[in-house]
Amino acid sequence: MREPRFWYGPVSLGSVLLAPIAACYGAVAAARLAREGTRAGCPVICIGNYHVGGAGKTPTTLRLVEILREIGETPVVVSRGYGGTLAGPVRVNETHRAADVGDEPKMMARHVPVIVARDRVEGAELARREGASVVLLDDGFQNPALAKDAAVIVIDAARGLGNRMIFPAGPLRAPLAPQVARTNALIVIGEGHAADDIAQGVVQRGGLVVRAAFVPEESSLARLRGARVLAFAGIGDPGRFFATLAKHGVELASRKEFADHHPFTEAELKALADEAQAGGLTLVTTEKDLARIEGDPALAAYAAQIVPFAVTLRVEDEGALLDFLKARMRRARQARQ
């Protein structure tokens, strides 16, 4: 879906009119947050966000995978597989398309074992059988089915939470206060102060707050140096993708926004390719978008023309984050003895 513009502006007539529906939605969401979940056979670390749309969960998950591997853990990611047709539980492999398992699981499976499961408890059980010493739950913060031993929330420092109203009047998935109360660590990504009060609330409740930034992979930058590009994206926050390109010196001659998880058609990609060719531009998109395009054999010729812009997450105080993860896993394992 494409986010309504009024979510990230002052409180508007649209949000006021939707407030009664939002109140009902929020009451149900708050009740779900309070429910006890089923405990998995190994520690579960949830990477989530407070709101609908993108916040950087996927690169955060992949960085946590690297951190955990460095201390001898065997992480396996469990994902609902949003946008895919398979209910699972199933381990993502090279034969799966993004249409089967979702674009994010397909992309992450290049780096880490990924289990797609509508039932997150069953997903965690399969992850354990696949050798997981710790489960990384991709999203699912507001879903009560699986108990979380640690909740790591990501938030954009500049964008924050918009009008801070509950869906559909605003972007929040549930009332903010109970979400903050259940946050064990907050990763504030980028520059800005829109999340400062939330960070303060997490600290006051004994949680960890660290700052981080997206850093482009050198291989991506090398392919774009000196080029004028046509950038396109169908993610939660396309503006952040475009801003990251510009920040690192990439000349954006044209930019195209699509809805999050948009299923690109051959006609759309042909139009993009034709515009790029006419203007002498390089086509560039996100890894997640390219995962959807590559999964469709009819789009293979277009996929070969597109440069994926890959980013990693750089955490400022990674030592504090590592200590946090160790402590939460140690506590979780002691509770299971």
From Swiss-Prot:
ATP binds at H51, V52, G53, G54, A55, G56, K57, T58. Keywords: ATP-binding, Kinase, Lipid A biosynthesis, Lipid biosynthesis, Lipid metabolism, Nucleotide-binding, Transferase. One of its GO terms (molecular function) is ATP binding. InterPro entries: LpxK, P-loop_NTPase. GO terms for biological process: lipid A biosynthetic process; lipopolysaccharide core region biosynthetic process. Pathway: Glycolipid biosynthesis; lipid IV(A) biosynthesis; lipid IV(A) from (3R)-3-hydroxytetradecanoyl-[acyl-carrier-protein] and UDP-N-acetyl-alpha-D-glucosamine: step 6/6. Transmembrane segments: none annotated. Pfam families: LpxK. SUPFAM superfamilies: P-loop containing nucleoside triphosphate hydrolases (SSF52540). One of its GO terms (cellular component) is plasma membrane. It catalyses: a lipid A disaccharide + ATP = a lipid IVA + ADP + H(+). Its EC number is 2.7.1.130. Transfers the gamma-phosphate of ATP to the 4'-position of a tetraacyldisaccharide 1-phosphate intermediate (termed DS-1-P) to form tetraacyldisaccharide 1,4'-bis-phosphate (lipid IVA). Belongs to the LpxK family. This is Tetraacyldisaccharide 4'-kinase. It comes from Afipia carboxidovorans (strain ATCC 49405 / DSM 1227 / KCTC 32145 / OM5).
